Swiss-Prot record:
Compartment annotation: Cell membrane
Name of encoding gene: ZP2
Functional summary from the UniProt entry: Component of the zona pellucida, an extracellular matrix surrounding oocytes which mediates sperm binding, induction of the acrosome reaction and prevents post-fertilization polyspermy. The zona pellucida is composed of 3 to 4 glycoproteins, ZP1, ZP2, ZP3, and ZP4. ZP2 may act as a secondary sperm receptor.
Tissue distribution: Expressed in oocytes.
GO cellular component, one term: extracellular region
Signal sequence segment: 1-35
Renumbered residue ranges of the record's region Disordered: 467-489
Organism whose genome encodes this protein: Sus scrofa
One term of GO molecular function: acrosin binding
Protein name per UniProt: Zona pellucida sperm-binding protein 2
Cysteines engaged in disulfide bonds, as pairs: 52-135, 85-103, 371-463, 402-423, 543-613, 564-632, 618-628
Glycan-linked positions: 93, 316, 323, 460, 530
Main location: membrane
Length: 716
């Protein structure tokens, strides 16, 4: 391909980064004569195609002008060559690409460029043609800062093309299809491209609106030609569009690359996260309404970016606004708009979304009267209980498929009879009460606007029994208990951590890593799971922490030794009595660990910590039971003698790590305000650094261990 550049060759080609979002439009004017003495060749219309982008135009010459293209140049209206104009002429492909800046003049809301073609076959090259070609100025007629961007709605994406006066003529606006035979829509790209008439397009997911010199195209996410990129629960939709019109030998093309993410954001106590799957594009900038923020500046503006397995943007909640809503208590968090600009296929493409955090539970029914004597919660739900009203057909209990026991659609009423031991009902003990809790959720009868993500209503139902309740003293006749199996099966142990010393509800496996700060105790419990024998007892041997999942990895921090508290840096491990709140107290061991125990010398906190314990199971009826007893008399204590072998000792580990942060962390207050369970974002943010740190620490520990072993061998 032969190329010719005009103007300052050091000037950057701004058209290379222009957006496909622009209107592609052809606007011909009559030709004029270059200078005195040059033969006039007057043409009423430029016979090629002009494509208008946001920052540049592309001129495609017809084959009949192929002999003249070698001597084509960009000139001003007087015929003088524009020396500052940097354009690229490609004689092989018969194209000319020129940026608006320095190559056009601004005339009544459009960019006007003049090109001159000289016939090299003419004597002394005295015959010339001049064409004035125009492109509309994108967004020039309105204050809309999102002009040239895809607008993402709940079920579709849209893009608006601008006209300049005179283009949206009556033939375009008429509904008569015969008047629009010159228009067609090309969807997709390359071999997958399909050409559709307007009527065909409107039956395949497209809609067209023309008003006030603008054309808006709405595209369903399932429309013909739309490509979907998926990763986990995130989805991105893309489709290249070309709106073509041919009339009187002139060609008009409106082209755009639409891009949209339609999934709701996820919110926690500190951040709002937007997930975008991998696709052929790279993030260029973010705009929250006050100007573009380059990727290199995101951290300074409270935005964190992850690029592993797609793209994740974490927005600090200080960037969000609050909205008082009838459906959200006390308020709803949202961003008024979020514009993301990507580099894709040598162009800049943008999309605008409107992120909102889903509402928290708006209604909580708490009454001891809900609990029945036969072990159920009876709950009535009315459609008018909220504004907007509920769609009672969508009511569900927890994560189960439990259905209402009574429906009265005319009265807008349903009734649930929720079993205390089914339908996902949870329970916990508090003082002398046992508390049962479940959740009913439904969709609104009148869904929110297309932009809103707030489509679900949640209601908590809770009841409790106290020691004075008659249910506790009721005698229930039942069949005789089956005889115990001779082989009880393998014994199962678990090591769990709790939010506080009440030991009511442990952290779930999906909540790891659990975030803790210096001076915060870590409440741990070792427990036997599948035994009901009151005569067996769980006895701790040693407990320790490591920086990896392997219990044998180095370095190690001891927290319990020989069943006794381990004093390290004046922060002693503390044991907690189990009490009578559990059925078999001897099947539990509870203690807490101070996070200062993991600060080593001048080093900082070992941020990811894994806990492990070795235990014995002793039979209190056995003559050797005294061998499993624990006697702690301070530093002079000796190791406990046991009658068991190492094979009978069992090791149990936490299901996940503890993430330790320093006191100065800016996330501490936000995490504490929501409880210790808000761990996901903070943990993920430091995970990459932790993997590297853990590897270094483990390697150094192994080298130290091998060095000591070698010295011992030499001494022997």
């Amino acid at each position: 391909m032969a190329c010719r550049h005009r103007g300052d060759s050091g000037r950057p080609l701004s058209w290379l980064s222009a957006s496909w979002r622009s209107l592609l439009l052809f606007f011909p004017l009559v030709t004029s004569v270059n200078s005195i003495g040059v033969n006039q060749l007057v043409n009423t219309a430029f016979p090629g195609i002009v494509t208008c982008h946001e920052n540049r135009m592309v001129v495609e010459f017809p084959r009949i002008l192929g002999t003249k293209i070698q001597y084509t140049s960009v000139v001003d209206p007087l015929g003088l060559e524009m020396m500052n104009c940097t354009y690229v002429l490609d004689p092989e492909n018969l194209t000319l690409k020129a940026p608006y800046e320095a190559c056009t003049k601004r005339v009544r809301g459009h960019h006007q460029m003049t090109i001159r073609l000289i016939d090299d076959n003419a004597a002394l090259r005295q015959e010339a043609l001049m064409y004035h070609i125009s492109c509309p100025v994108m967004g020039a007629e309105g204050p809309d800062q999102h002009s040239g961007s895809t607008i993402c709605m709940k079920d579709f994406m849209s893009f608006t093309f601008n006209f300049f006066p005179g283009m949206a003529d009556e033939n375009v606006k008429r509904e008569d299809s015969k008047q629009r035979m010159g228009w067609s829509l090309v969807v997709g790209d390359g071999e997958r491209a399909r050409t559709l008439t307007f009527q065909e397009a409107m039956t395949q997911g497209y809609n067209f609106l023309i008003e006030n010199q603008k054309m808006n195209i709405q595209v369903s996410f399932h429309a013909t030609g739309v490509t979907r990129y998926s990763q986990g629960n995130s989805h991105l939709y893309m489709v290249p569009l070309k709106l073509k019109h041919v009339s009187h030998g002139q060609s008009l093309i409106l082209a755009s690359q639409l891009i949209c993410v339609a999934d709701p954001v996820t919110c926690n106590a500190t951040h709002v996260t937007l997930a975008i799957p991998e696709f052929p594009g790279k993030l260029k900038s973010v705009n929250l309404g006050s100007g573009n923020i380059a990727v290199s500046q995101l951290h300074k503006h409270g935005i964190e970016m992850e690029t592993t397995n797609g793209l994740r943007l974490h927005f600090n909640q200080t960037l969000l606004k609050t909205n008082v809503s009838e459906k959200c208590l006390p308020h709803q968090l949202y961003l008024s708009s979020l514009k993301l600009t990507f580099h894709s296929q040598l162009e800049a493409v943008s999309m605008v979304i409107y992120p909102e955090c889903l509402c928290e539970s708006t209604v909580s029914l708490v009454s001891e009267e809900l609990c029945t004597q036969d072990g159920f919660m009876d709950v009535k739900v009315h459609s008018h209980q909220t504004k907007p009203a509920l769609n009672l057909d969508t009511l569900r209990v927890g994560d189960s498929s439990c259905q209402p026991t009574f429906k009265a659609p005319a009265q807008g009423l349903v009734q649930f009879r929720i079993p205390l031991n089914g339908c996902g009902t949870r329970h916990k003990f508090k003082n002398d009460k046992v508390i049962y809790e479940n959740e009913i959720h439904a969709l609104w009868a009148d869904p929110p606007s297309a932009v809103s993500r707030d489509s679900e209503f949640r209601m908590t139902v809770r009841c409790s029994y106290s020691s004075s309740n008659m249910l506790i003293n009721t005698n229930v006749e039942s069949l005789p208990s089956p005889e115990a199996s001779v082989k009880p099966g393998p014994l199962t142990l678990t090591l769990q951590t709790y939010p506080d010393n009440a030991y009511l509800q442990p952290y779930g496996d999906k909540e790891y890593p659990v975030v803790k700060y210096l001076r915060q105790p870590i409440y741990l419990e070792v427990r036997i799971l599948n035994r009901t024998d009151p005569n067996i007892k769980l006895v701790l041997d040693d407990c320790w922490a490591t920086s990896t999942e392997d219990p044998a990895s180095l370095p190690q921090w001891n927290v319990v030794m020989d069943g006794c508290e381990y004093n390290l840096d004046n922060h002693r491990t503390t044991f907690h009595p189990v009490g009578s709140s559990v059925t078999y107290p001897n099947h539990h061991q509870r203690f807490d660990v101070k996070t200062f125990a993991f600060v080593s010398g001048a080093q900082g906190v070992s941020q990811l910590v894994y806990f492990h314990c070795s235990v014995f199971i002793c039979n209190q009826l056995s003559p050797t039971f005294s061998l499993c007893s624990v006697t702690c008399h301070g530093p002079s204590r000796s190791r406990r003698a046991t009658g068991t072998t190492e094979e009978e000792k069992m090791i149990v580990s936490l299901p996940g790590p503890i993430l330790l942060l320093s006191d100065g962390s800016s996330l501490r207050d936000a995490v504490n305000s929501k409880g210790s369970r808000t761990n996901g974002y903070v943990a993920f943010k430091t995970m990459v650094a932790m993997v590297a740190s853990a590897g270094i620490v483990a390697t150094l520990g192994l080298i130290s261990y091998l060095h000591k072993k070698r010295i011992m061998m030499l001494n022997h």
